[in-house]
Amino acid sequence: MPQHDQLHRYLFENFAVRGELVTVSETLQQILENHDYPQPVKNVLAELLVATSLLTATLKFDGDITVQLQGDGPMNLAVINGNNNQQMRGVARVQGEIPENADLKTLVGNGYVVITITPSEGERYQGVVGLEGDTLAACLEDYFMRSEQLPTRLFIRTGDVDGKPAAGGMLLQVMPAQNAQQDDFDHLATLTETIKTEELLTLPANEVLWRLYHEEEVTVYDPQDVEFKCTCSRERCADALKTLPDEEVDSILTEDGEIDMHCDYCGNHYLFNAMDIAEIRNNASPADPQVH
């Protein structure tokens, strides 16, 4: 069995091409567990999680990344937040009926893929590409050609392992400032495209790579763990409350006795009573009643 929730980087010795392979199960399950999403929405979040992991490793930056789908369809938003440590969280918003076998365009409608990179140091960058491809992988390949001018191929698979949702993916990309031959890149992409879902989700990464590239010289680097991690906190909720008009906050307190702030990503609730609000307004730290 593979070591799930890991990202593996690899390099072809005789071609100016790099690759990545990632599988996720526990991370994906934690993203999905607090929601009752229709199956097509689960599949899109799984693909988005895999894609975000692969993109994060490719871009090689310190900071946060957000990859989101947004449009006018019944699933008008799906988003994965991550960082260079491969710590991920995600959520989707459903506002209409989802057909059982809905594809990406049926779910999102007229929409975009928005990639936002927020480095720990330096300027924030945002790239937007229209949802013109039939798959998320095709849209992101288009993004790389437009923004990075780097030929890139993504191969994303979703399924179940032992009855639980899992997903995996592979990425090939021409090395920056290298002159890889198109025929060589196409040859490697053709090999990679033969990967079966069952192989990717159930075999160790080294075996997958050997099956695909056993006639090539491949250097595989140490893997990086992928995990679910939510960045919500009581302090962040308090900061958000500071941005609301006092009248609005007081109205909620009068009506409900407390303010319940819910994190859509992890399901945590943060409760604030009148005393907490007074402390926030006085710039003190409120007590910590948090319920899961």
UniProtKB/Swiss-Prot annotation:
Its main location: cytoplasm. Under oxidizing conditions two disulfide bonds are formed involving the reactive cysteines. Under reducing conditions zinc is bound to the reactive cysteines and the protein is inactive. GO terms for molecular function: protein folding chaperone; unfolded protein binding. Coiled coil: none annotated. One of its GO terms (biological process) is protein refolding. GO terms for cellular component: cytoplasm. Pfam families: HSP33. Disulfide bonds join C230-C232, C263-C266. It comes from the Bacteria. Keywords: Chaperone, Cytoplasm, Disulfide bond, Redox-active center, Stress response, Zinc. InterPro entries: Heat_shock_Hsp33, Heat_shock_Hsp33_C, Heat_shock_Hsp33_N, Hsp33_helix_hairpin_bin_dom_sf. The keyword Disulfide bond applies. It is found in: Cytoplasm. NCBIfam families: PRK00114.1. Belongs to the HSP33 family. Redox regulated molecular chaperone. Protects both thermally unfolding and oxidatively damaged proteins from irreversible aggregation. Plays an important role in the bacterial defense system toward oxidative stress. This is 33 kDa chaperonin. It comes from Escherichia coli O17:K52:H18 (strain UMN026 / ExPEC).
